[in-house]
């Protein structure tokens, strides 16, 4: 019985926070269409963003010049000057929140959680290049461009595309010019490599010839020096001298044969006379 009593007392205490957390009629809610309009960065270059900021400046009725005739840079500088409350040349997070709330969703300032805070975080993440949490006029005007050459990025950094969708830069003239320039560079590189390969055999032959010239034997060096000085005959003169030596050797042989024949002739005469004497005896 005591347990049932405790459960009955605890049940209202558990249901009370849920009842307070549930939305009630009459509580201001942000329009879903307004929430969708808060997602893009209003400082991003584009005709819709510029028109929205021009309408905001036009509604202030504090501008000497008609905002419709102002370009994007003039509009952003005017917004910067209006919301730089401390006049330090920089916009902090609160000043950005005040500017974007007034420009995008004026009624969102009364909400417990301002949805424009997400837009402020996106602006600081995208345009606060030095990461100090402050926006300068240059950072506000110079919106960083999204990299267009996704093909040059590593596969891990490329955004996945749904199946059946074509790449955005498939037929862009910039990509075709880039591919043509890359093809031209590859052709020039191939020609240079082919020319270098054709010159390598000639360079090797030249190196071999120089090596042969450098590695001459001592006899050839001595002969070359003698030929240059005139002491040793050249190849043609040596051949003529060898022919003359051979002719002289032939003549000497002929003289030797004739001498031997002349020496043998008296001996034959003496032998013949001795034989005649023997016959007579």
Curated annotation (Swiss-Prot):
SUPFAM superfamilies named among the record's database cross-references: EF-hand (SSF47473)
UniProt biased composition (Polar residues): 168-183
Gene Ontology MF terms: calcium ion binding
Keywords: Calcium, Cell adhesion, Cell cycle, Growth arrest, Metal-binding, Phosphoprotein, Repeat, Secreted, Signal
Highest taxon of the lineage: Eukaryota
GO CC aspect terms: extracellular region
Transmembrane regions: none
UniProt modification remark: Probably digested extracellularly by an unknown serine protease generating extremely hydrophobic bioactive peptides.
UniProt: Ca(2+) 1 binding residues: 84, 86, 88, 90, 95
Modified positions (Phosphoserine) in chain numbering: 217, 228
Stored Gene3D superfamilies: EF-hand (1.10.238.10)
Signal peptide boundaries: 1-21
Annotated S-S bridges: none
Feature: compositional bias, Basic and acidic residues: 184-213, 237-256
One of the GO BP terms on file: cell adhesion
Domain (EF-hand): residue spans on this chain: 71-106, 115-150
UniProt subcellular location: Secreted
Chain positions covered by the region annotation Disordered: 148-281
InterPro entries associated with the record: EF-hand-dom_pair, EF_Hand_1_Ca_BS, EF_hand_dom, ER-Golgi_Adhesion_Reg
Residue numbers binding Ca(2+) 2: 128, 130, 132, 139
Functional note: Mediates cell-cell adhesion in a calcium-dependent manner. Able to inhibit growth in several cell lines.
This protein's domain notes: Both EF-hands are required for function.
Protein name (Swiss-Prot/TrEMBL): Cell growth regulator with EF hand domain protein 1
Lineage: Eukaryota, Metazoa, Chordata, Craniata, Vertebrata
Gene name in the database record: Cgref1
């Amino acid at each position: 019985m005591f347990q049932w009593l405790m459960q009955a007392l605890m049940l209202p205490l558990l249901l009370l926070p849920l009842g307070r957390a549930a939305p009630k009629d009459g509580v201001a809610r942000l329009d879903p269409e307004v929430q969708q309009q808060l997602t893009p960065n209003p400082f991003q270059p584009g005709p819709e963003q510029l028109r929205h900021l021009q309408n905001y400046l036009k509604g202030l009725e504090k501008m000497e010049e008609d905002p419709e005739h102002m370009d994007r840079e003039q509009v952003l500088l005017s917004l910067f000057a209006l919301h730089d409350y401390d006049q330090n040349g920089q916009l902090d997070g609160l000043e950005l929140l005040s500017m974007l709330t007034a420009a995008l969703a004026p009624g969102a300032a009364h909400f417990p959680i301002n949805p424009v805070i997400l837009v402020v975080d996106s602006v600081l993440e995208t345009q606060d290049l030095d990461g100090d949490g402050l926006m300068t006029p240059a950072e506000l005007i110079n919106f960083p461009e999204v990299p267009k050459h996704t093909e040059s990025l590593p596969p891990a950094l490329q955004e996945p595309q749904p199946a059946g969708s074509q790449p955005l830069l498939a037929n862009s003239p910039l990509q075709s010019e880039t591919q043509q320039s890359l093809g031209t560079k590859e052709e020039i590189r191939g020609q240079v490599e082919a020319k270098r390969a054709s010159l390598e055999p000639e360079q090797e032959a030249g190196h071999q010839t120089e090596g042969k010239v450098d590695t001459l034997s001592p006899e050839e060096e001595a002969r070359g020096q003698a030929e240059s000085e005139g002491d040793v005959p050249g190849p043609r003169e040596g051949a003529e001298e060898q022919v003359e030596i051979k002719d002289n050797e032939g003549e000497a042989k002929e003289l030797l044969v004739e001498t031997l024949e002349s020496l043998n002739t008296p001996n034959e005469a003496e032998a013949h006379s001795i034989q005649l004497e023997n016959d007579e005896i």
